[in-house]
């Protein structure tokens, strides 16, 4: 995923958290807000452990989001918040992201 798709500014995060809507799955909470482009941010708190663990979780979330990027049909700012637990896997994040994107109607499957 290129840097063009990353939500980086504090102002953007605040607007998504204040004005956005939320969807919930087993291991992820998704906060989203309509925008002019597709961007994703990741909010991993210190409750998840040290910096190594937090960065691993963010890498897994980024990779999961990257796999759905071609299928997203609408422009939104997304913020993914993982729930605190012991272990995380890429397959679990992908499964939960697919559920959230289908529940929110974000996927545009061209088949």
Residue ranges and their predicted role:
Residues 1-111:
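Positively charged, solvent-exposed patches that mediate nucleic-acid binding
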């Amino acid at each position: 995923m290129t840097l063009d798709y990353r939500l980086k500014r504090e102002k953007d995060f605040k607007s998504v958290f204040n004005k956005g809507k939320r969807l919930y799955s087993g291991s992820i909470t998704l906060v989203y807000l309509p925008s002019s482009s597709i961007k994703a941010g990741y909010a991993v708190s210190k409750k998840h452990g040290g910096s190594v663990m937090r960065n691993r979780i963010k890498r897994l979330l980024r990779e999961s989001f990257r796999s759905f990027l071609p299928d997203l049909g609408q422009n939104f700012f997304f913020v993914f918040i993982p729930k605190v637990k012991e272990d995380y896997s890429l397959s679990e994040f992908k499964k939960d992201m697919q559920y959230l994107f289908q529940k929110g109607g974000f996927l545009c499957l061209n088949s």
